[in-house]
C-alpha cells in the first residue's frame, strides 16, 4: 500500500520516556519525546501519553499507532503487564485514545513494531517473509509473512525467547542476560572489554553467539523466512558473536534454508516510531 498523502502518528512507549512523530509521505517529521512517570498510577502514565499526542495531533492526522513493551490484545487494544510500568495491567489503551482523539488507534507489541518499521522503511523493504529479532536484555521478535505482520491467534506469536532451552530458555542464554546469568558480570562491561580485545570477553560473546545461533535455528524450523534483521543493543557486538552464531545456523537440517537466509543488522533510526505508524498501513493493505 502506498503511504503517500497519509498522515499517521507513530508512538514508541519505553521504560522512561515516550517518543513520537508524524509519518507524512514516507518521511518522519515533528519528532518529540516526553518523560514517562513509570512508577505512577495508570492515569498519570496515561496523561503522559496524552500530553505527547496532544503536541502532534491536527485535523490532517488519519490514525495513531502505538508500540508498547507488553503482550497486547490487538483487536481490543488492551495492554497487559507493561514492562517497567507496574501500574499498567489490562489497560484499555485503544479505547482511551480513540475516545479522546476520535480517530482509529492501533496498539501492538514493540518488537512487532520494530519488524514493521524495517519492512516498510528499513532493510526489509521488498522482502515478503522476514523476522525482526530484537536482542537486548531479552529476546523479542516480529514476524512478517506474505507482507503482513503475523501476531498469532492470541497475539503471542514471536516469543521465541521463552522457548525451553537447556535448563532455562533461549532468552536466558541467547540475549544480553547471558553475561549476568552465567558469569555474573554486567554486559556493558563485557562489551567494553571485548572492544579492547580482551580474549575472555570475546570468548563470552562467542558462547552467547552459539546459543543465539541455536535460537535462530529454531526460528528457521518454525518460519522458513528469507531475512532476519537484528535489532536491540546486543547487535552492536555482532562482530564478536557472529562467527559462532553462523556455525550453529549452518548445521540446520535443510541446507538451502541455511544457505539462503540473510541476517542483517538494523541501521534504521526511530524504528519504533516508524513501525508504530506502519501498523495502520499493515492493517489497510
State each model region's role:
Residues 69-72, 136-138, 234:
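Short glycine-rich anion-binding loops that position phosphate/pyrophosphate groups of nucleotides
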Residues 1-63, 73-78, 95-103, 118-122, ...:
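ATP-binding/phosphotransfer module of carbohydrate and carboxylate kinases, centering on a glycine-rich
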Residues 125-177:
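Glycine-rich phosphate-binding loop of actin/hexokinase-like ATP-binding domains
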Residues 115:
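Acidic/histidine-rich catalytic cores of soluble enzymes
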Residues 105-109:
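General beta-strand structural signal in soluble alpha/beta enzymes
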Residues 77-90:
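A charged helix-plus-loop insertion that forms the helical arch/lid used to bind
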Residues 24, 68, 75, 145-146:
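A cytosolic small-molecule/anion-sensing beta-strand core signal
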